[in-house]
Swiss-Prot record:
Amino acids binding ATP: K269
Family, per entry: Belongs to the class-I aminoacyl-tRNA synthetase family.
Chief place where the protein resides: cytoplasm
Keywords in alphabetical order: Aminoacyl-tRNA synthetase, ATP-binding, Cytoplasm, Ligase, Metal-binding, Nucleotide-binding, Protein biosynthesis, Zinc
GO molecular function, one term: cysteine-tRNA ligase activity
Protein name listed in UniProt: Cysteine--tRNA ligase
GO cellular component: cytosol
Location(s), subcellular: Cytoplasm
Entry EC number(s): 6.1.1.16
Source species taxonomy: Bacteria, Pseudomonadati, Pseudomonadota, Betaproteobacteria, Neisseriales
Record flagged with keyword RNA-binding: no
SUPFAM superfamilies hit by this protein: Anticodon-binding domain of a subclass of class I aminoacyl-tRNA synthetases, Nucleotidylyl transferase
Species, as recorded: Chromobacterium violaceum (strain ATCC 12472 / DSM 30191 / JCM 1249 / CCUG 213 / NBRC 12614 / NCIMB 9131 / NCTC 9757 / MK)
Manner of cofactor binding, per the entry note: Binds 1 zinc ion per subunit.
Length: 457
């Protein structure tokens, strides 16, 4: 049985969906004002694996990952670039989808945009006002009255008393309590705005996810996920809004992925250690990035360095090399009673334990290398596929390259043929020179009875 760590209860729990055989899951997606960075890759890949495992476990999964397409950062960046917010949003969504494809992400069931749900946001805010949980201010904003929601702080542990005692909160004369947060922002000149009972304006960030999740999954659903930085205030405020509006539990299980640090420090532009997915893709294959993320447990912090990415590349190369040269039988699906598959399943059923599952893949690859058994190789490929790995032909991965200055496959084959000709002519010096040239270019040759095969180092 699947168990998962629930941030809400701070413990592992057996997973019991609201509706047997079906899972409803919402994950906070991108605010589309800039390219996705490696931290976003962690979240995207982590919840993609969770989605895949739920599907592999036989569940019918309704997976919703939103797009925040109206927000202060979007307006500011569009102004800086001299384009409209709409132009920036469309450009950034296209970039995001290219990055998602490079990481091998499955598309979510639904990918709603905030601007398509403003009417629902207005309706929820009206309900919150009617329930005494929110109030319009004189400046045209609408605020959530946090003191009116008894359970505030239950997700993050940051209760109102702790917040007032431990954090400096800027006083705003429009708020009844400095900790109240905005649900609706009054329109400012030149900014996108919508009509509402409180005048023209736009929704606050937190209300967007409450409305989009409930629209697609209902007022009470199974799983809500996101990065651990969203626990507070975003997810805490989502709970206050949704439960304040509907009067019952919003989400049963809250999942949060850990951060990616760069050389042991938090990634930030000011430290000069900020990497977009595009930056990393210039040097590493997208599947290598995915493997780097997947081989660590989703809740653990992960350190990013070039040497660690190179180690991930070598690890994935080992797995693909085990499949090389074996004609695989057609897959009949995974037999979960097989010893390796059963261990893989036990790891994944324990809070999506990908690090242990990857260890099983390496053990299985070692067995395949020894036996060259097509059935074991098929199992290796199928189990890897559950994690979104090993989905390509081994030759495509092993001989594919990224980065400038690398030899093309055609150039490598031509040099291998020249080396073969030199060996046939017993010109050993030329043969060695060509091998050394290929080695210097990162090409590994393996001579065997069937000829020479190659891969990139």
């Amino acid at each position: 049985m699947l168990s998962l760590y629930n941030t809400l209860t701070r413990q592992k729990e057996a997973f019991k969906p609201i509706e047997p055989g079906k899972v409803s899951m919402y994950v906070c997606g991108m605010t589309v004002y800039d390219l996705c960075h490696i931290g976003h890759a962690r979240m995207l890949a982590a919840f993609d694996v969770i989605y895949r495992w739920l599907k592999a476990s036989g569940y019918d999964v309704n997976y919703v990952r939103n797009i925040t397409d109206i927000e202060d950062k979007i307006i500011k960046r569009a102004l800086e670039r001299g384009i409209t917010p709409e132009q920036l949003v469309e450009e950034t969504i296209a970039d995001m989808r290219q990055d998602a494809a490079a990481l091998g992400l499955l598309p979510p069931t639904h990918e709603p945009r905030a601007t398509h749900h403003v009417g629902g946001m207005v309706a929820m805010i009206e309900q919150l006002i009617a329930n005494g949980k929110a109030y319009p201010a004189a400046n045209g904003d609408v605020y959530y009255a946090v003191r009116e929601f008894e359970g505030y702080g239950k997700l993050s542990g940051r209760t109102l008393d702790k917040l007032r005692a431990g954090e400096r909160v800027e006083v705003d004369p429009n708020k009844r309590d400095p900790l109240d947060f905005v649900l609706w922002k009054a329109a400012k000149p030149g900014e996108p705005s919508w009509d509402s009972p409180w005048g023209k304006g736009r929704p606050g960030w937190h209300i967007e996810c409450s409305v989009m999740s409930c629209h697609h999954l209902g007022e009470h659903f199974d799983i809500h996920g996101g990065g651990e930085d969203l626990q507070f205030p975003h997810h805490e405020n989502e709970i206050a809004q949704s439960e304040g509006a509907h009067g019952h539990q919003y989400v049963n299980y809250w999942l949060h992925n850990g951060f990616i640090n760069v050389d042991g420090e938090k990634m930030s532009k000011s430290l000069g250690n900020f990497f977009t997915i595009r930056d990393v893709l210039q040097h590493f294959d997208g599947e290598v990035i995915r493997f780097f993320i997947v081989r660590s447990h989703y809740r653990s912090p992960v350190n990013y360095t070039d040497s660690i990415l190179n180690d991930a590349k070598h690890g994935l190369t080992r797995l693909y090399t085990a499949l090389r040269g074996i004609e695989l039988p057609t897959s009949d699906g995974i037999d979960w009673n097989h010893a390796y598959a059963a261990r893989f399943k036990a790891a994944m059923d324990d809070d999506f334990g990908t690090s242990e599952a990857v260890a099983v893949l390496f053990e299985l690859a070692g067995e395949v290398n020894k036996s060259r058994d097509p059935q074991l190789a098929r199992l290796l490929k199928d189990l890897g596929g559950v994690l979104g790995l090993l989905t390509r032909d081994p030759e495509v991965f092993l001989q594919g390259g990224v980065g400038e200055g690398e030899l093309s496959a055609e150039q490598v084959e031509a040099l291998i043929q020249a080396r073969k000709d030199a060996r046939a002519a017993k010109d050993w010096a030329e043969s060695d020179r060509i091998r050394d040239e290929l080695t210097a270019k990162g090409i590994v040759l393996e001579d065997g009875a069937g000829g020479t095969i190659w891969r990139r180092a």
